[in-house]
Amino acid sequence: MARACLQAVKYLMFAFNLLFWLGGCGVLGVGIWLAATQGSFATLSSSFPSLSAANLLIITGAFVMAIGFVGCLGAIKENKCLLLTFFLLLLLVFLLEATIAILFFAYTDKIDRYAQRDLKKGLHLYGTQGNVGLTNAWTIIQTDFRCCGVSNYTDWFEVYNATRVPDSCCLEFSESCGLHAPGTWWKAPCYETVKVWLQENLLAVGIFGLCTALVQILGLTFAMTMYCQVVKADTYCA
């Protein structure tokens, strides 16, 4: 009976981790594709220049693949050490995510102020050598969200030391349109515009976060159940 339970949990554990591993492969693939086609796209922070969408996806994908591989191997081999390692790694990730979420909601105002200050600092790197990713990111954000600057279009005046903005701030794009009168530029601040967009999509973000948490809890349950079954089977055989 104990052996039958172990086999059932084993196959469920393997199937779960196979899907987990394939998900990691997908995330890693998207990250590599972004890195190859978009360069350092979405590198907006001047303090963390390596914190690009591509790099985050590559690191996340590789880590998920590693955890999934450990879980698959632990399930197939019925290895207590690997199962416990998988459980501890997944528990660490779960606790880290929970801590980040709690800190984010607890210090929202401070994070807002720091983010705006850091983004304004990053504006001074716009269009400079070696900052293609940051330049592309600002161009895309200002064009797609129809906004200009971090808190105001005048943020760009400090960057250029003149009354001008990047051409991506223009209502109708044309070469050197950023030198024209302010009436031809987007007036909405990018930080608040993107923040409102995120708030409008908060339900989708919440559902995604909840699904992620449920998957992780399911993985922890499978791992600990199988670990206990392996221990029980070893004790029974002994």
Curated annotation (Swiss-Prot):
Q: Which InterPro entries match?
A: Tetraspanin/Peripherin (IPR018499), Tetraspanin_animals (IPR000301), Tetraspanin_CS (IPR018503), Tetraspanin_EC2_sf (IPR008952)
Q: Where in the cell is it found?
A: Membrane
* Keyword Glycoprotein annotated: yes
Q: Which residues lie on this side of the membrane: Extracellular?
A: 35-55, 107-201
Membrane in keyword set: yes
CDD domains xrefs = NET-5_like_LEL
- Glycosylated positions are N152, N161
> Which Gene Ontology terms of cellular component type are present?
plasma membrane
Ranges annotated as spanning the membrane: 14-34, 56-76, 86-106, 202-222
Give the UniProt keywords, A-Z: Glycoprotein, Membrane, Transmembrane, Transmembrane helix
Main subcellular location of this protein, as a coarse class: membrane
Cytoplasmic side, ranges? 1-13, 77-85, 223-238
Membrane topology classification: Multi-pass membrane protein
**Protein origin, superkingdom:** Eukaryota
**Family annotation (Pfam families):** Tetraspanin
Its subunit composition reads: Forms a complex with integrins.
Q: Which family does it belong to?
A: Belongs to the tetraspanin (TM4SF) family.
**What is the protein name for this chain?**
Tetraspanin-4
Q: Which organism is it from?
A: Pongo abelii
